[in-house]
């Protein structure tokens, strides 16, 4: 049962991060296409947003390890 819980935690964490990263990057590309002069600021904010979204799978892996080893 703990294997299933670990797999679900990692899978949903990766799914959420993939969707979130895709949305962030697509909106950034749209913004840069509209205002090329704001590209540097948008790119910086994009990397901050992607880093925050990537925290989700890391937390999911920790939860999966806790479920697997407890």
Curated annotation (Swiss-Prot):
Keyword entries, A-Z: ATP synthesis, Cell membrane, CF(0), Hydrogen ion transport, Ion transport, Lipid-binding, Membrane, Transmembrane, Transmembrane helix, Transport
Gene3D superfamilies assigned to the protein according to its UniProt record, in alphabetical order: F1F0 ATP synthase subunit C (1.20.20.10)
Gene Ontology cellular component annotations, sorted alphabetically: plasma membrane; proton-transporting ATP synthase complex; proton-transporting two-sector ATPase complex, proton-transporting domain
One Gene Ontology molecular-function label: lipid binding
Record localization: Cell membrane
Domain of life, per lineage: Bacteria
InterPro entries: ATP_synth_csu_bac/chlpt (IPR005953), ATP_synth_F0_csu (IPR000454), ATP_synth_F0_csu_DDCD_BS (IPR020537), ATP_synth_F0_csu_sf (IPR038662), ATPase_proteolipid_c-like_dom (IPR002379), F/V-ATP_Csub_sf (IPR035921)
Protein family (similarity comment): Belongs to the ATPase C chain family.
Function: F(1)F(0) ATP synthase produces ATP from ADP in the presence of a proton or sodium gradient. F-type ATPases consist of two structural domains, F(1) containing the extramembraneous catalytic core and F(0) containing the membrane proton channel, linked together by a central stalk and a peripheral stalk. During catalysis, ATP synthesis in the catalytic domain of F(1) is coupled via a rotary mechanism of the central stalk subunits to proton translocation. Key component of the F(0) channel; it plays a direct role in translocation across the membrane. A homomeric c-ring of between 10-14 subunits forms the central stalk rotor element with the F(1) delta and epsilon subunits.
Complexes and interactors: F-type ATPases have 2 components, F(1) - the catalytic core - and F(0) - the membrane proton channel. F(1) has five subunits: alpha(3), beta(3), gamma(1), delta(1), epsilon(1). F(0) has three main subunits: a(1), b(2) and c(10-14). The alpha and beta chains form an alternating ring which encloses part of the gamma chain. F(1) is attached to F(0) by a central stalk formed by the gamma and epsilon chains, while a peripheral stalk is formed by the delta and b chains.
Entry protein name: ATP synthase subunit c
Species assigned in the record: Bacillus licheniformis (strain ATCC 14580 / DSM 13 / JCM 2505 / CCUG 7422 / NBRC 12200 / NCIMB 9375 / NCTC 10341 / NRRL NRS-1264 / Gibson 46)
Lineage: Bacteria, Bacillati, Bacillota, Bacilli, Bacillales
